[in-house]
C-alpha cells in the first residue's frame, strides 16, 4: 500500500439504539457524528491527523453532552520507514515464514520509526454539558532513542516523552454533570469541591473558571499555574 496524501471523512446524522429494556446500557441517541482522518507528507516526513465531532449524545445513565470535539495529530515521522511498516503489515498474511519471524520484523520496523522521534499535538478539544464546558490542549514530542525491544521502549518512555497540557473548565459543567448523574450539590458543597481541586491541581481560578497547566519533561511533572 502506497502512502497517499488526502482525507477520509465519515458523517452520520443520527444513530439510535433502543432496547426492550430502556435502562439497558447503551440505549440512547447520538447526533451529528463526524470523523475525519488525514495524511500529510513531504519528501521525507509524514503526518497523520484525526478529528472527531459529536453534536449531541444522550445515553441512559450517562450524563448527556454536546459540542464534543477531539483532535489528535502526529507529525515528523520518517516517510520511508512508515511506508516500509505498512508494506510489512500488508505482506504479513501472505508471507511464508514463521509467525514469530514476521512479528519480529514488524516490531523492528515499528521501533525504527519511534527511535527517530516525532511530535504530536491535540488542540481545541472541548465538551459541553448543559451550559458548562471544558477545553483541553496538548503538545509534545517523543525524542529520538535507540531502543531494540518493546520492553526497553516501555522502560525508557518516561525519559523520552515531553508534553505540555492545558485544561480549562467551568463550575457549571461540574454541577450539570453531577446533576445528570443523580447527585445534587449545594452551592457551598460545589464551592468546597472547586477549592479542593484548585489546591490539588495548583489551578488558576478566574471567577467560575479553573485553568490547569501541566508540563512533563525528563520524567517529571510540574504544574505551571
Describe these PLM feature segments:
Residues 1-225:
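Glycine-rich, small/hydroxylated-residue low-complexity segments
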Amino acid at each position: 500500500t502506497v502512502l497517499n496524501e488526502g482525507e477520509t471523512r465519515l458523517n452520520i446524522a443520527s444513530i439510535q439504539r433502543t432496547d426492550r429494556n430502556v435502562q439497558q446500557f447503551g440505549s440512547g441517541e447520538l447526533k451529528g457524528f463526524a470523523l475525519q482522518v488525514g495524511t500529510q507528507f513531504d519528501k521525507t516526513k509524514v503526518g497523520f491527523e484525526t478529528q472527531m465531532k459529536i453534536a449531541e449524545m444522550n445515553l441512559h445513565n450517562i450524563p448527556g453532552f454536546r459540542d464534543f470535539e477531539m483532535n489528535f495529530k502526529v507529525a515528523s515521522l520518517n516517510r520511508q520507514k512508515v511506508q516500509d511498516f505498512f508494506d510489512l503489515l500488508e505482506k504479513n498474511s501472505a508471507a511464508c515464514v514463521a509467525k514469530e519471524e514476521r512479528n519480529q520484523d514488524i516490531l523492528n520496523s515499528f521501533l525504527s520509526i519511534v527511535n527517530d522521534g516525532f511530535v504530536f499535538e491535540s488542540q481545541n478539544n472541548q465538551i459541553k454539558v448543559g451550559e458548562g464546558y471544558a477545553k483541553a490542549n496538548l503538545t509534545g514530542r517523543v525524542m529520538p532513542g535507540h531502543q531494540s525491544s518493546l520492553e526497553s521502549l516501555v522502560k525508557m518512555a518516561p525519559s523520552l516523552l515531553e508534553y505540555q497540557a492545558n485544561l480549562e473548565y467551568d463550575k457549571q459543567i461540574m454541577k450539570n454533570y453531577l446533576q445528570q448523574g443523580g447527585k445534587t450539590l449545594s452551592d457551598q458543597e460545589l464551592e468546597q469541591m472547586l477549592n479542593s481541586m484548585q489546591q490539588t491541581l495548583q489551578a488558576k481560578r478566574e471567577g467560575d473558571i479553573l485553568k490547569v497547566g501541566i508540563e512533563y519533561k525528563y520524567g517529571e511533572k510540574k504544574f505551571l499555574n
